[in-house]
């Protein structure tokens, strides 16, 4: 079907007295899950939005709102996570049904964390502002994922539902699958029609649209769909900085809508019957974020807020929700391309841990180099104790070596112990497998000094600072 536009105007009075889940409830399709790291999705909500865990002592802190119905109190996170790294451990459900999202377990595909679990998101990696106040999104890099397989009140079978997510329109890739929504409970891709989610990205393996992407599509299992056809449907590529993405479904009827989360209304990209083989639906009612239903972990994206509803929302209800989102005031924080992760700065040299020549080749030995702005010096300390660079490479003890002089290299993240590190309060970084310290070879300080493992000795060439 042809895309149609519906422009709506947002007013601050409505935004002050009613939030998205109040609007859905007034329309007869209440939220059964409401997730956000940026603001309350009910006017009366004054509980926690999410929880973070810091690496320095593994303690946790709930991050709440400045006031009931308001935006996040990001200063709580900034204070708690100062001079260390933090990950997001829980994204709370504001609906009261306890459909919170936590670290995704393994499915058909395994994640890079121990036990096949997925990584948790770096809590500092997606700074923005909302309503003029600082906030953070959930930045999903390949290997990151959240899930709840034991939910309450989420649509199953062919029951109707609506889903929306506000995402970063500039942070995506062409792989599977940056999803948010309803998924299977066992993590296996054993049937079509067992999930229904919003997908945002440029994956063309199944459905796709006009241009190069990204597109708003639906992940229904055994395929991403941009419309009724299994392949191409005439939906546009999206170029907004912040995107409102919506998918909704009821028996043999579904729709895709979307718009600019900073202004204007929604466009209906598809509204029609289910694809062949997808009627009736067999939804199972789990909820996921950042991954495919079978725990496909190759997608990339950033999530700010989203809900699942009971019942098929009307276009008028969705238009009012979009007006509320646009009035919320999503904006960038000091630039459109915030850097992910931290620099690891040598206490003796003042230089940064660096991947030579921005190489991505397995086996490249890490070195010291003057600190710069490149991604080859930005590391994320993950929930599984990996020091991850480029989103998919990890600092690695070569050959699983545990002897003095073992080279410290980069390698595809695989969850093994030689890629796990303890970031200690005394400034050392020690290998979990070896117990040895990350060491600037021969106590050298020059550019190009190679990094190795060495017995911890208290010297300054084994002391490091994590710097945002």
Language-model regions, residue ranges each:
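Secretory targeting and sorting signals
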Residues: 1-15
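GGW-centered surface loops in extracellular recognition modules
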Residues: 16-112, 164, 327-333, 341-342, ...
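Extracellular glycan-associated modules
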Residues: 18-31, 40, 55, 86, ...
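Compact disulfide-stabilized, cysteine-rich extracellular microdomains and processed peptide cores
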Residues: 41, 290-293, 320, 357, ...
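Short, hydrophobic/proline-enriched secondary-structure or compact coil segments at domain edges
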Residues: 44-57, 136-138, 165, 287-290, ...
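Residues that flank catalytic or metal-binding motifs in active/ligand-binding sites
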Residues: 46, 87, 134, 159-161, ...
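Acidic glycine-/aspartate-rich tracts in secreted/extracellular proteins
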Residues: 57, 95-97, 170-172, 250-252, ...
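Extracellular glycan-recognition/adhesion modules and their associated mucin-like linkers
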Residues: 336-360, 375-402, 417-445, 463-468
């Amino acid at each position: 079907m042809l895309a149609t536009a519906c422009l709506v105007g947002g007013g601050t009075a409505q935004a002050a007295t009613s939030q998205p889940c109040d609007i859905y409830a007034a329309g007869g399709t209440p939220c059964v899950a409401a997730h956000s790291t940026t603001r309350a999705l009910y006017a009366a909500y004054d509980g926690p939005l999410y929880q973070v865990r810091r690496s320095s002592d593994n303690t946790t802190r709930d991050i709440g709102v400045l006031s009931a119905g308001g935006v996040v109190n990001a200063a709580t996170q900034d204070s708690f996570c100062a001079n260390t790294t933090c990950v997001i451990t829980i994204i709370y459900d504001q609906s009261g049904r306890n459909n919170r999202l936590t670290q995704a377990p393994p499915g058909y595909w395994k994640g890079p964390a121990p036990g096949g679990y997925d990584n948790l998101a770096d809590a500092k990696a997606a700074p923005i502002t909302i309503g003029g106040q600082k906030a953070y999104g959930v930045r999903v890099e390949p290997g990151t994922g959240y899930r709840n397989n034991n939910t309450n009140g989420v649509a199953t079978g062919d029951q109707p539902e609506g889903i929306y997510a506000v995402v970063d329109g500039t942070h995506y890739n062409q792989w599977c699958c940056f999803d948010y929504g309803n998924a299977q409970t066992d993590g296996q891709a054993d049937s079509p029609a067992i999930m229904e989610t919003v997908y945002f990205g440029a994956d063309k393996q199944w459905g796709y649209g006009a241009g190069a992407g990204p597109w708003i599509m639906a992940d229904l299992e055994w395929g991403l769909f941009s419309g009724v056809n299994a392949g191409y449907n005439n939906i546009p590529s999206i170029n907004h900085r912040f995107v409102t993405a919506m998918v909704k479904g009821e028996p043999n009827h579904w729709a895709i809508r979307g718009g600019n989360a900073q202004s204007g209304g929604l466009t209906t990209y598809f509204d029609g019957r289910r694809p062949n083989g997808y009627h009736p639906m067999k939804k199972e009612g789990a909820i996921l974020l950042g991954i495919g239903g079978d725990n496909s972990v190759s997608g990339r994206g950033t999530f700010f807020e989203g809900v699942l509803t009971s019942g098929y929302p009307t276009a008028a209800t969705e238009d009012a929700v979009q007006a509320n989102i646009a009035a919320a005031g999503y904006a960038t924080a000091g630039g459109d391309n915030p850097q992910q992760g931290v620099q690891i700065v040598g206490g003796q040299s003042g230089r940064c841990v660096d991947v030579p020549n921005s190489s991505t080749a397995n086996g490249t030995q890490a070195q010291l180099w003057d600190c710069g702005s490149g991604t080859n010096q930005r590391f994320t300390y993950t929930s599984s104790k990996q020091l991850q660079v480029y989103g998919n490479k990890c600092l690695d003890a070569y050959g699983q070596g545990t002897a003095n002089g073992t080279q410290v290299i980069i390698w595809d993240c695989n969850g093994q112990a030689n890629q796990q590190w303890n970031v200690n309060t005394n400034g050392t970084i020690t290998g979990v497998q070896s117990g040895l310290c990350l060491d600037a070879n021969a106590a050298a300080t020059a550019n190009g000094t190679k990094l190795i493992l060495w017995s911890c000795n208290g010297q300054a060439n084994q002391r490091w600072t994590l710097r945002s």
